[in-house]
Structure formats: structure tokens, C-alpha cells
């Protein structure tokens, strides 16, 4: 039976379609209604609880039959992956506050121990629900398409023979069982690794009879093993590694009786404790921290739901965890390893229809990309439009004899990065290449260290950003000599220089040679690479200096327009809203009559729809095929509309503790284009969720005679080139 979380309705309730009108504020409430002050904790949603709500929306997609079946499975696995990181970072951070007696309530008023209690309650419900969806919905549906995960009770004699041989040849030689006794203490287990606790009976060759053993499963072993068709029958048949180990645990303890074998998985604190202000060599210090991350403090224990209480209690004691941190699951404890089967070539009908990102006509046949950009700005929206022009710009720069220098920020670039390849080529071809690499990009630290070493070996100058501030800005600057003068070309984006993400995330890219904007980009690079006072910018807003103030000023300007009785409208789209100062500014704007439409994919600590405070604010979240990642800010500005694109969300960490960029969209054509694309998010009635005043999200559905509208499908149709039956 599928359980419904307490903060979600049993069935998605239809929400009336929103019509985009710049001048339709909700009337102010009656003066008799008590209006809370803007510091009142009831006006704010706890950050971590809001993040959990986002993950619940992701899980809901696994039940949506409008998605192809393997994509629904993928959403369920993304839920697991997100939850892993949530415990590794967010839960670990709350526990750390408690352990160091540094409990401090946020704007919402919740103390860390109170938040942890609510998190535990909600996650227990959602994890049980997740496995129910897997076992009762997705696996039976997959079996109809001849994709099977064969449990032990359904093994045929032929399959048992094949499994025994596979276990003997491929698994047993690699596994190292550890018996527990005074000379064999409980092993130090790697974060998120698959392990088994085994209860034994009997005495071994040395007379030992401790009764317990641990089997760590090496990460090099696949978690799902495909069975040959001649053994398992037609279709794609799989056996879990855990099932193989359960079935043959006796073989690992010769002469002893296995009373029980149960899988478990430990999640540890994975946040790096490195303080960049207290180290002399950041790269060297980071390498040491990366190893210790695998063995941080325990924050969660997952065990098979068949595991007896005395064994789960034993494990909890070993890891100094409480019972509220124990999660019993009906299936594999490491679901993220199932990602390997979601791209089956044999079942394209169970996956999204492939598409080819478009290349604008201006660039499609251009021999010289610099000549195109010199005439006009080029705006790309990924993944509907290709990331290739960004790579091509850098490739041409690497080979162009007129290019003098290239400067580039890198936060996440992925393996086998074409961007990094082009930077290496540029350096080898004698260009002055400077790369500002953020070594502390979470979970990409090791990759970025390797990237830095490769660029240094090619002759590039590598800078590790600014001490105390992560460099999250996405910018490239190319200096080229033209007719005796140095001309600047720049790329600014809302997303990373990561070709893989550019096929999965929605992001904007701006290619420009605008004198003022490229000069600003050059100034920001100078600040990052050298030292000196903050430089005055002409067009660019940049954190941690002018971006937050600039956003607050623009919100205040709309507020003033509303107070003067003029139309006032803000549309903002980004990933997360947690900054209390920004939220208060939005509340004040709403109270003054500004119509505010927010499209916030993830965390949102603002409560919309509260009479007298946020009655003019609507918050939507779009969850669909592509991960929404664009940061777009629209201001009506008394009819002189302004739109900014940014690398930053409205979060304290982005606005106060990171190097970020925010740049204007200029020219009537581009301005109208981005506005139209932004408005599409306000009328989506298939993938939109609307935030309620009580913190719930309600899914939008077409009502009456409305046609289904998906903003992602519309953009895909309008901007890209669909390719059928091609992978």
C-alpha cells in the first residue's frame, strides 16, 4: 500500500491556470486581519524541510504515467541520490551544530534538534513509499516489458547453477569476510558502501565462535548482474549482487552455519572540514581531506527490513546512531546503482524520444564565429539549443593566430571535457591561458584537482579562486587583436561548462563582444587573478559586492512604482530562495501591491499567499524531463522592462559567500524572447507545482477546456530538432 506523506495531498489537486498579467495585484486584505511582522517565524519555511519537499516532488514523477517507464525509474533513483547528499551534507550539518552545542534557530524558528525530528519523520514515510513504488508499481511494469530483477525465490535450477558459478569465479575471490572478535574489531566502513552483517553458529578452525561477521562488498563489483538469455530466458534479466551474496554466504564461512545474512549501508558526513583561510597549499590540503571524507561521522543507517532487531541495534551502537536514524528498506539498500540499466539500448520505447539540440542559423554555417559575435549578441537556451557553439568559440580561439589570451572559470566540467581540451590546445599553441578553477565544487573536488594538473602541465596559469569565497561565476574571456586593436569576446552563462549537463539542464548562454560588458568581465577576472579594490562595473552585477544590493534595489524600485499607483511586476526564476533579506524585500513589495511570480525549482523559504504579507506572490516549481537551472530576473520597471541572467540563486551563500555574475539581456529582440520563454513557466499546467501558504505543494492539472501545456515540451518543439528512433 502506497503511503501519502503528511505534507502532500493524496491526489494532485487541479490549480486554475494562471494568466500572465503584469498589472493584476491581489487587493490588500481587510484592516481587521492581523498581519504578522516580517520577522515573524511563521512567515518562513525551514530550509531543510523545503529541500525535502523538492525531493518528494521528484519521487512523485515516478508515478506519472506520462513519462516513459525507464524515465520513471530514473526519477525514483534520483530521489535516492538526492537523499544521499541531503544526509551527507544537510543532516550532517544539523547534527554537527547539536554536537558542538551551537544550536541556532533560523528565520523559521526551528532549532536543529527539532528540524532533525521532523526530517526523520518525513523521510521514514517517504523511503517506505519509495520502495512501495519500486516493488508494487515499477518492477511489475518493467516485467511486462521483459525487464526482470529475479529474486532468489524465483531462481530456476538452471539459474541457480549459473549464479553459483558466477559467484565462485567473479565474486568470492574479491570479497574479504571479517569475523568479529577481540583481534578483529568492527571494520571502518566506507561511506555509502554495500555491506552485510552475518550471524553465524559453530566454531571455526581456531576455536573462535563470536557469532558475527561483516562482509564489505567492494565497489568494483556490479550491484546488478545481467543473466544470459540462455539461462534467464528472453529479455533483460538481472540478479542483484546482494542476492548472490545472501545465497552463497555459507561458502564464505566453511564449516559454520549461517543463521542470517542482511545487507546494510552507512551514510557518513561528506562535507569537507577544510578552511581555505587556514592552509598554505589548498590543493595539497584538499587531497588529504578527500580521503578522510569517506570516513566521516555516521548520519544514517539503512538495513534490510528482514534484519532482526538485535542485529540492527548492534549496528546502531557501533556507529553511535539512534533508532530514529535507522531506515529499514524492502529491497536493495543502494538503489542509485540501478542507474546502469535505465539506458537500455534494447528498449528505446521506454525512454525519452531523443532530440538534437539546434544551432542558430547565424552560427550553423559560420566559418568565423568571431565575425558573427562582433555583429550581434547570440543567446542560447540549453539543452534545446546546442552547447557546441560555446565549445567551438574556444576551439577557434585556440587555433586563431590573432587570439592573444583566454581566461576561463571552471566549476564543474565533467570527464573528457571538450572545454578543457580546447584550453589545453590554446596553451600549447602559445596563447596566454588563465583558468580560475574552483577546487571546492562539492563532490567534484578530485576531478577539478586532476583538471588543474592537466592545465598546468600544458602551460596554463591555474588559479584556485579567492580564499573564503567559492568561484561560481560562469564566464569566458577571449582577447583578440583586430586591425591593430585588442577586442574582447565573452561568454557568460547560468550553468557550468559541462557538455553533459548542457543536455540535461536548462541554462542560458550569452556570446557577446559588447564593449562595456566584456570590459566588466575583464575587470572581474583581474579581481580574481590579482589583488586590489573592488572595480566599478558598467553593466555587470557581481557577488559578493554589487549583486545582492542590485537585486534589492530593483525590488525596491518596483515597490515604489506600486506605491505610486503604477503597474509593478517581478518574475524571477531560479533554483532556491533562502536569503531572509531578499524574502523580506519581496514581502514588502507584495504588501505595496507588486505582482510577484516566482519559479523556484528547489528550496523556497518564503510562504506565498499570506493575507497582508504575501498575497501578491505566487511560487511555482517545474519538475520535468530537464532539470530547471536557469536564473532569470524580470522587472517591469515602469514599462522600461529589464531582464537579468545570473549564475546565482537568491541564497545567502550565492549572494554573500561566492563570486557570481549577473548580466543584462539587451536589445528588444532578445528581451522579448526571454520574456516569452519566462512567461511559459507561468502557464505550465502539466509539470508545475504551486506552493501553498502551509508549505504544501499542489500539482497543476488542466481544468475545464484547458489544453495541457508543458513549457519544456514547447521549448523543445520550438527550439530543437527532434530526431525519431535515433540514439
From Swiss-Prot:
Pfam families: PP_kinase (PF02503), PP_kinase_C (PF13090), PP_kinase_C_1 (PF17941), PP_kinase_N (PF13089)
InterPro entries found in the cross-reference section: PP_kinase, PP_kinase_C_1, PP_kinase_middle, PP_kinase_middle_dom_sf, PPK_C_dom2, PPK_N_dom, PPK_N_dom_sf
GO molecular function term, any single one: ATP binding
Cofactor: Mg(2+)
Residues where ATP binds: 82, 505, 601, 629
Annotated catalytic residues: 472 (phosphohistidine intermediate)
SUPFAM superfamilies: Phospholipase D/nuclease, PHP14-like, PPK N-terminal domain-like
Keywords: ATP-binding, Kinase, Magnesium, Metal-binding, Nucleotide-binding, Phosphoprotein, Transferase
Post-translational modification, as annotated: An intermediate of this reaction is the autophosphorylated ppk in which a phosphate is covalently linked to a histidine residue through a N-P bond.
Binding site for Mg(2+): 412, 442
A cellular component annotation (GO) from this entry: polyphosphate kinase complex
Biological processes per GO annotation: polyphosphate biosynthetic process
Reactions performed catalytically: [phosphate](n) + ATP = [phosphate](n+1) + ADP
E.C. no: 2.7.4.1
Described purpose of this protein according to its UniProt entry: Catalyzes the reversible transfer of the terminal phosphate of ATP to form a long-chain polyphosphate (polyP).
Similarity section: Belongs to the polyphosphate kinase 1 (PPK1) family.
This protein's name: Polyphosphate kinase
Gene: ppk
Amino acid at each position: 500500500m502506497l503511503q501519502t506523506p503528511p505534507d502532500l495531498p493524496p491526489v494532485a489537486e487541479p490549480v486554475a491556470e494562471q494568466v500572465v498579467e503584469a498589472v493584476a495585484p491581489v487587493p490588500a486584505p481587510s484592516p481587521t486581519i492581523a498581519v504578522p511582522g516580517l520577522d515573524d517565524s511563521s512567515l518562513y519555511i525551514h530550509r531543510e524541510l523545503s529541500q525535502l519537499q523538492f525531493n518528494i516532488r521528484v519521487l512523485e514523477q515516478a508515478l506519472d504515467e506520462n513519462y516513459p517507464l525507464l524515465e520513471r525509474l530514473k526519477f525514483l533513483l534520483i530521489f535516492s541520490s538526492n537523499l544521499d547528499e541531503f544526509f551527507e551534507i544537510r543532516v550532517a550539518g544539523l547534527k554537527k551544530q547539536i554536537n558542538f552545542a551551537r544550536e541556532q534557530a533560523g528565520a523559521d524558528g526551528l532549532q536543529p534538534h527539532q528540524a532533525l525530528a521532523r526530517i526523520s519523520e518525513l523521510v521514514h514515510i517517504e523511503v517506505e513509499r519509495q520502495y512501495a513504488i519500486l516493488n508494487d508499481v515499477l518492477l511489475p511494469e518493467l516485467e511486462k516489458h521483459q525487464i526482470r530483477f529475479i529474486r532468489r525465490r524465483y531462481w530456476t535450477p538452471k539459474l541457480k547453477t549459473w549464479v553459483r558459478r558466477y559467484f565462485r569465479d567473479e565474486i568470492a575471490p574479491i570479497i574479504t569476510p571479517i569475523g568479529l572478535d577481540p583481534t578483529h574489531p568492527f571494520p571502518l566502513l566506507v561511506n555509502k558502501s554495500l555491506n552485510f552483517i552475518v550471524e553465524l553458529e559453530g566454531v571455526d578452525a581456531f576455536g573462535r565462535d563470536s557469532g558475527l561477521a561483516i562482509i564489505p562488498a567492494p565497489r568494483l563489483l556490479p550491484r546488478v548482474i545481467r543473466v544470459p538469455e540462455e539461462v534467464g530466458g528472453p529479455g533483460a534479466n538481472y540478479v542483484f549482487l546482494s542476492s548472490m551474496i545472501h545465497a552463497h554466504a555459507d561458502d564464505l564461512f566453511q564449516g559454520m552455519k549461517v543463521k542470517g545474512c542482511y545487507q546494510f549501508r552507512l551514510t557518513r558526513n561528506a562535507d569537507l572540514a577544510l578552511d581555505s583561510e587556514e592552509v598554505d597549499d589548498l590543493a595539497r590540503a584538499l587531497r588529504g581531506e578527500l580521503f578522510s571524507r569517506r570516513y566521516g561521522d555516521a548520519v544514517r543507517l539503512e538495513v534490510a527490513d528482514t534484519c532482526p532487531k538485535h542485529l540492527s541495534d548492534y549496528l546502531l551502537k557501533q556507529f553511535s546512531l539512534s533508532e530514529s536514524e535507522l531506515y529499514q528498506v524492502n529491497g536493495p539498500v543502494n538503489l542509485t546503482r540501478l542507474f546502469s540499466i535505465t539506458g537500455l539500448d534494447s528498449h528505446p520505447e521506454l525512454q525519452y524520444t531523443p532530440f538534437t539540440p539546434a544551432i542558430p542559423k547565424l552560427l550553423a554555417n559560420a566559418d568565423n564565429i568571431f565575425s558573427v559575435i562582433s555583429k550581434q549578441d547570440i543567446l542560447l537556451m540549453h539543452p534545446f539549443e546546442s552547447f557546441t557553439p560555446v565549445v567551438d568559440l574556444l576551439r577557434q580561439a585556440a587555433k586563431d593566430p590573432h587570439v592573444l589570451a583566454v581566461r576561463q572559470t571552471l566549476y564543474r566540467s565533467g570527464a573528457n571535457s571538450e572545454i578543457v581540451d580546447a584550453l589545453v590546445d590554446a596553451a600549447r599553441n602559445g596563447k596566454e591561458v588563465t583558468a580560475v578553477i574552483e577546487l571546492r565544487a562539492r563532490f567534484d573536488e578530485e576531478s577539478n584537482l586532476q583538471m588543474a594538473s592537466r592545465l598546468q602541465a600544458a602551460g596554463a596559469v591555474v588559479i584556485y579562486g579567492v580564499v573564503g569565497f567559492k568561484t561560481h561565476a560562469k564566464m569566458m574571456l577571449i582577447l583578440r587583436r583586430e586591425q591593430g586593436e585588442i577586442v574582447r569576446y565573452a561568454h557568460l552563462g547560468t550553468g557550468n561548462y559541462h557538455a553533459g549537463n548542457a543536455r540535461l539542464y536548462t541554462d542560458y548562454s550569452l556570446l557577446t563582444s559588447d564593449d562595456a560588458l566584456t570590459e566588466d568581465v575583464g575587470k572581474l577576472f583581474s579581481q580574481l587573478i590579482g589583488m586590489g579594490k573592488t572595480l566599478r562595473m558598467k553593466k555587470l552585477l557581481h557577488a559578493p559586492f554589487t549583486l545582492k544590493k542590485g537585486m534589492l534595489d530593483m525590488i525596491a524600485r518596483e515597490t515604489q512604482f506600486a506605491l505610486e499607483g503604477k503597474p509593478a511586476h517581478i518574475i524571477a526564476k531560479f533554483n532556491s530562495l533562502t536569503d531572509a533579506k531578499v524574502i523580506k524585500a519581496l514581502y514588502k513589495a507584495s504588501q505595496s501591491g507588486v505582482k510577484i511570480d516566482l519559479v523556484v525549482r528547489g528550496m523556497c523559504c518564503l510562504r506565498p499567499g499570506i493575507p497582508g504579507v504575501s498575497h501578491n506572490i505566487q511560487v511555482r516549481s517545474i519538475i520535468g524531463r530537464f532539470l530547471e537551472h536557469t536564473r532569470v530576473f524580470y522587472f517591469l520597471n515602469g514599462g522600461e522592462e529589464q531582464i537579468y541572467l545570473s549564475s546565482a540563486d537568491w541564497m545567502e551563500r550565492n549572494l554573500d559567500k561566492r563570486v557570481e555574475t549577473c548580466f543584462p539581456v539587451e536589445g528588444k529582440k532578445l528581451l522579448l524572447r526571454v520574456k516569452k520563454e519566462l512567461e511559459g513557466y507561468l502557464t505550465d499546467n502539466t509539470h508545475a507545482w504551486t506552493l501553498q501558504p502551509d508549505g504544501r505543494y499542489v500539482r497543476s492539472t488542466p481544468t475545464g477546456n484547458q489544453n495541457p501545456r508543458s513549457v519544456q515540451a514547447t521549448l523543445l518543439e520550438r527550439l530543437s530538432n527532434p530526431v525519431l528512433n535515433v540514439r
